[in-house]
Each structure stands twice: as structure tokens, then as C-alpha cells.
Amino acid sequence: MAKKVTAVIKLALPAGKATPAPPVGPALGAHGVNIMAFCKEYNERTKDQVGLVIPVEITVYEDRSFTFILKTPPTAVLIKKALGIETASGVPNKQKVGKLTDAQVEEIAKIKMPDLNANDLEAAKRMVRGTARSMGVDVE
């Protein structure tokens, strides 16, 4: 028989740097999850992606055990990494912060494909271009 799910918690944590401090501790502690076990496992599974923010969906069961699914990093984080910038534009229509090539857009779209509700790569590329434009990034 399947275990009964008591909660689904969504967090966005820096890869390889999860600690029991907020936001992890309070979110998991409220459901009686072993916080250190989660932190160790999360850090182990994300150690090759250090520097990125990785969203995670934690499913907590009735017996206080848990499983978690790692998602792909947010599109904005991947765009900032590709351009080597810290922050996006505060006024995206007037102030541009960089240019993204079509090859970079395609690479980001391929990374994001499992989490997007796009049917093909072209649709995924359009989503990435839209995110880039809203960040003040020109797309060539």
C-alpha cells in the first residue's frame, strides 16, 4: 500500500548549500522531517551545480519520511549565468544589460525543456526569449 502524503513543500535553494537555517529549518520542521538528512541528501545531489538556485519539491509522508524532486534552475538564473551578470535591468524597456545569442537561447531552452509545458524546442525558445526581454536582455 502506498504511503499517505501529508505535505508537499516547494523551496528554491542554492545548490550544494542547504543548511538547517531558514528557510529550510522552519519549512521542514513544521512537518517533523529530519532536517539534517534532507540537507545532506540535497547538497549531495546538487554539488555539481554550485552557484545556481535549484527549486526542489519535497513530498512529506505520514511516517515523517520524505522524497524530493529537483527541478531545473529558473530561466532568469540561467540567462544571468550565460551573460555573466549579477542582476537584470530595473527598467527593461529603456536600459539593456546584455545580448543573448540564438545558440545561448537554444542551450537554455534545452536545459529547461523537462519543466516547461512546451511541445517542442521552438516553443521553449520563445519562452526563454520572453523571459530575457522582461529582464532587459536583447535577443539576437
UniProtKB/Swiss-Prot annotation:
Protein known as: Large ribosomal subunit protein uL11
Name of the coding gene: rplK
The organism of origin for this protein: Symbiobacterium thermophilum (strain DSM 24528 / JCM 14929 / IAM 14863 / T)
CDD domains (alphabetical): Ribosomal_L11
Entry annotated with the keyword Ribonucleoprotein: yes
Processing after translation: One or more lysine residues are methylated.
Keywords from the named record: Methylation, Ribonucleoprotein, Ribosomal protein, RNA-binding, rRNA-binding
Quaternary context: Part of the ribosomal stalk of the 50S ribosomal subunit. Interacts with L10 and the large rRNA to form the base of the stalk. L10 forms an elongated spine to which L12 dimers bind in a sequential fashion forming a multimeric L10(L12)X complex.
Pfam families registered for this protein in UniProt: Ribosomal_L11, Ribosomal_L11_N
Family: Belongs to the universal ribosomal protein uL11 family.
A GO CC term assigned to this protein in UniProt: cytosolic large ribosomal subunit
